[in-house]
Amino acid sequence: SFRLGNGADLALNGALNYSYATRTFSNMENSRYGVYNKVEDKPEYYYKYTDDQYQTNVKVGALLNLAYLNGKNRYYFRNIFNQIGQDKLTLREGWQNMSSLYIQEKTEYCYTSRSTYSGQIAGVHTLELGTLDWDAGYSYADKNQPDRRIVNRQENDMVGDAHYGQMQIDQNEIRRDFMKLREHIASAGINYSCTLREGSSFAPELKVGLYGEYRTRDYRTRAYFYRFDTDNLPADFAYGDVIDDILQDGNYGADKLYIYDDSDNRNSYKGDNIL
């Protein structure tokens, strides 16, 4: 804190934080159970997968508060900001047994970030008759998932086929999802209080105030599938490495490998509210 030339006091409080961490989760079981097998006394699975997950997490935060005190008047300026970012890679292997047994491999890569900010200006004034306080604030929050990528592959179980036992992709099994959420909140309030008949045995307190708030939110999603026409691609196209063989410039075309927009506007919305 500081004492200013006019006799007022100024106080400052600030902080910064940063963290970086990597995490690995190995051999996690991801299963769904059906009806328990009482005859063999063991669980029955609808699917049973083993996941390996690799995460990188980054967190950043900042805090800055100011206070100005001058006699019977006090003013405050408050700010806080936080952001979290996460890179995540999940590798999944296992099987699904709904109508038949399917050996599967699944890969997911996504980056997700979340940010929040809150700021406020406030004042407190001691009057001859009572106390007056007011504040005005703004808050912001967002969540961003700019490119979630999912690849699903399944083992060819057709006995006698040239690619029997190999992992392959099918239509719609390479997908990309995009999501963004933003929210803004602005608010203001004022309050007045005073004690009536101060000093007497019966001294009621009068309080009045006003408050207003405006909130707006915008949520947007997009979804894409990769589809392909096997008649215009190599016979072993679906069995290649997804990055090195399939998603190559030479494979793209309206009658070859193309991107299908599967976005549904019902999954997106925009709204506001006044209080």
Regions found by a protein language model. Name each.
Residues 18-22, 70, 81-85, 127, ...:
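Transmembrane beta-strands of outer-membrane beta-barrel pores
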Residues 58-64, 115-121, 136, 184-190, ...:
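Hydrophobic, lipid-facing positions within transmembrane beta-strands of outer-membrane proteins
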Residues 12-16, 77-79, 132-136, 206-210:
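Membrane-embedded beta-strand positions of outer-membrane beta-barrel proteins
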Residues 1, 159-173, 220-269:
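Flexible glycine-rich, low-complexity coil/linker segments exposed to the extracellular/periplasmic environment
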Residues 36-48, 94-105, 162-174, 252-263:
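Flexible, solvent-exposed coil segments and beta strand-coil junctions
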Residues 21-30, 76-97, 102, 141-154, ...:
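Outer-membrane beta-barrel and related beta-rich outer-membrane complex signature
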Residues 1-90, 114-119:
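Transmembrane beta-barrel wall of Gram-negative outer-membrane proteins
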Residues 2-10, 72, 128-131, 145, ...:
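Short loop/turn motifs that connect adjacent beta-strands in outer-membrane beta-barrel proteins
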